[in-house]
Swiss-Prot record:
Purpose of the protein: Acts as a processive, ATP-dependent zinc metallopeptidase for both cytoplasmic and membrane proteins. Plays a role in the quality control of integral membrane proteins.
Quaternary structure and interacting proteins, as annotated: Homohexamer.
Induction: Slight induction by UV-B light.
Protein name: ATP-dependent zinc metalloprotease FtsH 4
Source organism per UniProt: Synechocystis sp. (strain ATCC 27184 / PCC 6803 / Kazusa)
Pfam families: AAA, AAA_lid_3, FtsH_ext, Peptidase_M41
SUPFAM superfamilies: FtsH protease domain-like, P-loop containing nucleoside triphosphate hydrolases
Length: 628
């Protein structure tokens, strides 16, 4: 859907008037100088000779010019005298004797009268300066308001973009995949906009507002555009941050202007992206004082959304946020945002549908199995998958291929997950050997401990900012629940790299820093969040945060606990991590020969994957006394 063009007739009329006035002024100023004839210019010496020769009749002496008229000459004595003499001009010089010469010859002379300004020039002298001042003032006003019409009050106008139906870029529900539940909820809104009588006949009321919540990149904005495209109604889109302005009251004025425009074009949809920019709870301390600009904007939004219609037509408000926990409760009450629709990351089937949509836009090789790509991308949102397809196409173009292959997709996945290959980062032979054993340690422990997923690739090619190598584990299915045993398996797999360094080199390096951090965090969550402690029992010591789609940041705050309880938590976390470490050591000691063989092979090839890797890892044996 394209942006609806703004009417331009006012600007065109102003341009015509401006150019017409400019041309008129230029003609009046330049025409006299261009078309008025000037007397011939002569040297001052010739002028003196003519005065001495008694040929001059009269002289007008000016500051910058002397004009004089010659005496008429008689052709013959029986004929009339010729017409008046010729008028000439010359440039004066400092000559104090000139008046005496003129008087001695009896020549009439006088000072030239001062030039008189015309009525037009007088008018310009009064009009032009104020016009210049007004023009400069208008220029800076328009510059501060990005050229928007409305002059000094333009900042009170809504900055919403209006999308209308009718072009090839129209978005429908067919362009959205992986969020079937959200599509179903919005389909009801679309159906009401198309056939309102079906609902009003039963006394039903459509929700006045629908709030789309979910992680970034899951398609909330795309869903709102698709809803407007399916309904075939005008679609107003604006970001929450565009309401807030430096001027006090501008945000509230823009809210009023937005809803006034929406009422005029009803039925329509108003979409407010990033609602948390103006909808934060007033009780959270986010506002500094009762007259804060954001609070005024929120109050105006609450007022406008409290049930409004335009001549029986409907205006529906859609909004999107990834921080619903920060929104004001008054904004979420029934009658304003009646529904909250979760737009979550897609599952395997959803990822496959999204890949099929974006794969239509590129030249795909016939051998590509999109289901394999969907399986290798757990946790990817719609925007991540779109970027993945584009990265694969760019890689194919870089390699001058005719189509995009599955190898391009695998490389694109690794670029997104682990970062770019750093082939220019040269490691010493010793460091390269340490990295090789470290990554093989992860792989061998992961092959015995299935809780972390299937090992798909081992690489010692540096990637990203810090990774000197990596072991890629891919889940075989979408998982939503993990048991205690699987979490312990993940901890043991994370510590497999450090365990391999201890066994082979009898020392440890800084390469396991991230592994230790992740293992400790996971063990702490087992104790404080999931209640997986035999000593502390089924208690949660973390204050959970619901609907936190942006990640945990600094982590959930811990409840107030006694010193003894805090000590028990630390001991339990330490015991879980140490147990995982011992499991990793036992597995690698039991498979020491295989560890050496795979490490030598990866030092030669740098990358092992596919059937070769599966064959090697299939030889791993679990020790008989493995502690679980």
């Amino acid at each position: 859907m394209a942006i609806k063009p703004q009417p331009q007739w006012q600007r065109r009329l102003a341009s015509v008037l401006l150019w017409g006035s400019t041309i008129y002024l230029l003609v009046n100023l330049l025409a006299p100088a261009l078309f008025r004839s000037q007397p011939p210019q002569v040297p001052y010496s010739l002028f003196i000779d003519q005065v001495e020769g008694d040929k001059v009749a009269s002289v007008y002496v000016g500051q910058n010019e002397i004009r004089y008229q010659l005496k008429p000459e008689a052709e013959d004595e029986g004929k009339e005298k010729a017409a008046e003499g010729q008028i000439l001009r010359t440039t004066p010089i400092f000559d104090l004797e000139l008046p005496k010469r003129l008087e001695a010859k009896g020549i009439e002379f006088a000072a030239a009268p001062p030039a008189k300004n015309s009525w037009f020039g007088t008018l310009l002298s009064w009009v032009i300066p104020p016009l210049i001042f007004v023009g400069i003032w208008s220029f800076f006003l328009n510059r501060n308001n990005n050229g928007a019409p409305g002059g000094a009050l333009a900042f009170t106008k809504s900055k919403a973009k209006v999308y209308v139906e009718g072009d090839s870029t129209k978005v429908t529900f067919d362009d959205v995949a992986g969020v079937e539940e959200a599509k179903t909820e919005l389909s009801e809104v679309v159906d009401f906009l198309k056939f309102p009588q079906r609902y009003t006949a039963l006394g039903a009321k459509i929700p006045k507002g629908v709030l789309l919540v979910g992680p970034p990149g899951t398609g909330k904005t795309l869903l709102a555009k698709a809803a407007a495209g399916e309904a075939g109604v005008p679609f107003f889109i604006i970001s929450g941050s565009e309401f807030v302005e430096l001027f006090v009251g501008a945000g509230a004025a823009r809210v009023r202007d937005l809803f006034e425009q929406a009422k005029k074009q009803a039925p329509c949809i108003v979409f407010i992206d990033e609602l948390d920019a103006i909808g934060k709870s007033r009780a959270s301390g986010a506002f500094m004082g009762g007259n804060d600009e954001r609070e005024q904007t929120l109050n105006q939004l609450l007022t406008e959304m409290d049930g409004f219609s335009a001549a029986g037509a409907t205006v529906i408000v859609l909004a999107a946020t990834n921080r619903p926990e920060t929104l004001d409760p008054a904004l979420l009450r029934p009658g304003r945002f009646d529904r909250q629709v979760l737009v979550d990351r897609p599952d395997l089937a959803g990822r496959l549908k999204i890949l099929e949509i974006y794969a239509k836009k590129i030249k795909l090789d016939k051998e590509v199995e999109l289901k394999n790509i969907a399986t290798r991308t757990p946790g990817f949102a719609g925007a991540d998958l779109a970027n993945l397809v584009n990265e694969a196409a760019l890689l194919a173009a870089r390699n001058k291929q005719d189509s995009v292959t599955e190898a391009d997709f695998r490389e694109a996945i690794e670029r997104v997950v682990a970062g770019l290959e750093k082939k220019s980062r040269v490691l010493s032979d010793k460091e390269k050997k340490i990295v090789a054993y470290h990554e093989v340690g992860h792989a061998l422990v992961g092959a015995v401990m299935p809780g972390g997923g299937q090992v798909a690739k081992i690489s010692i090619v540096p990637r990203g900012m810090a990774a000197l190598g990596y072991t890629l584990q891919m889940p075989t299915e979408d998982r939503f629940l993990l048991n205690e045993s699987e979490l312990r398996d993940q901890i043991a797999t994370l510590l497999g790299g450090r365990a391999a360094e201890e066994i082979v080199f009898d020392s440890i390096t800084t390469g396991a820093a991230n592994d230790l951090q992740r293992a400790t965090d996971l063990a702490e969550q087992m104790v404080t969040t999931y209640g997986m402690s035999k000593v502390l029992g089924p208690l949660a010591y973390d204050k959970g945060q619901q609907n936190n789609f942006l990640g945990q940041g600094m982590g959930n705050p811990r409840r107030m606990v006694s010193d003894d309880t805090a000590k028990e938590i630390d001991l339990e976390v330490k015991e879980i991590v140490e147990q995982g470490h011992n499991q990793a050591l036992a597995i690698l000691e039991h498979n020491r020969d295989l560890l050496e063989a795979i490490a030598e092979k990866i030092l030669e090839k740098e990358v092992i994957e596919g059937e070769e890797l599966h064959h090697l890892l299939g030889q791993v044996q679990a020790p008989g006394t493995l502690v679980v």
